[in-house]
């Protein structure tokens, strides 16, 4: 992970020009207010920077590590001199400072009497649960996996997103009153009773297939299956030998050069 000290982080943030039309904000799927939290950061106002970031982003410690950083690709400094503000790394630094300095304090809101079931404990389900819980709804998350996180836990390698970072946030959500029912397969024809509404947040766990010559040959695997299996092995799970995806000693061709392929 990037290890620039706080002084260098502030210098990076000071490079933000607070453009009249902030393309960084416009291209961010979350609508993050990059110029505003960069301004607070460059002035050393870490708490304020986190407050601005938290307005639009429930989990900046995740996105600050694995987001494709569309904001940086559209940064005017990127377009003019190919050296954008390090927005994503600044975001991660702000989130880590918030945990370290105690800015993140679990709050159990006053309940409004409504119960919501969230199906899926991936990033979408967790975000929905966090927002609904903050509004006073009593939220229970269901997921078929033994641990929450979805692709954050089972699809992203540890070197990009350490699992203790996920666990730390789950502890906050639990302390705020969100309940987790893990290892539960939900039948969409028979939803769990006792809830006023349901949010289906099952994500996209199915890999994209290719209809090309040779697709039927043996030894072809989806990256998601391989990454998920490796993460589960690191968590202590075991698999029969015939189910293991092992490339040791073999010549490997990777189709796709994005983050997953890398």
Summary of predicted features, one role per range:
Residues 1-13, 33-65, 81-108:
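Ferredoxin-type iron-sulfur electron-transfer modules in oxidoreductases and energy-metabolism complexes
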Residues 18-43, 64-92, 140, 144-147, ...:
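Iron-sulfur cluster-binding cysteine motifs and their immediate structural context
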């Amino acid at each position: 992970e990037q290890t620039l000290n706080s002084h260098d982080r502030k210098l990076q943030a000071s490079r933000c020009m607070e453009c009249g039309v902030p393309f960084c904000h416009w291209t961010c799927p979350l609508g993050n207010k990059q110029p505003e939290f960069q301004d607070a950061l460059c002035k050393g106002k870490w708490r304020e920077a986190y407050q601005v970031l938290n307005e639009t982003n429930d989990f900046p410690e995740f996105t600050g590590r694995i987001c494709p950083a569309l904001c940086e690709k559209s940064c005017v400094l990127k377009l003019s001199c190919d050296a954008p503000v390090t927005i994503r790394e600044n975001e991660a630094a702000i989130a880590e400072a918030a945990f370290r300095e105690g800015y993140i304090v679990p709050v159990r809101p006053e309940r409004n009497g409504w119960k919501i079931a969230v199906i899926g404990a991936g990033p979408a389900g967790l975000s929905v649960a966090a927002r609904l819980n903050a509004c006073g709804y009593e939220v229970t998350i269901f997921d078929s996996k033994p641990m929450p996180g979805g692709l954050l836990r089972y699809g992203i390698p540890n070197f990009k997103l350490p699992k203790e970072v996920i666990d730390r946030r789950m502890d906050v959500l639990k302390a705020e009153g969100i309940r987790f029912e893990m290892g539960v397969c939900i039948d969409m024809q028979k939803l769990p009773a006792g809830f006023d509404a349901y949010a289906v947040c099952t994500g996209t766990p199915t890999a994209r297939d290719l209809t090309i010559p040779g697709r039927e040959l043996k030894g072809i695997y989806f990256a998601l299956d391989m990454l998920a299996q490796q993460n589960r092995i690191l968590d202590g799970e075991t698999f029969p030998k015939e189910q293991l995806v092992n490339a040791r000693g073999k010549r490997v061709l990777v189709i796709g050069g994005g983050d997953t392929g890398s």
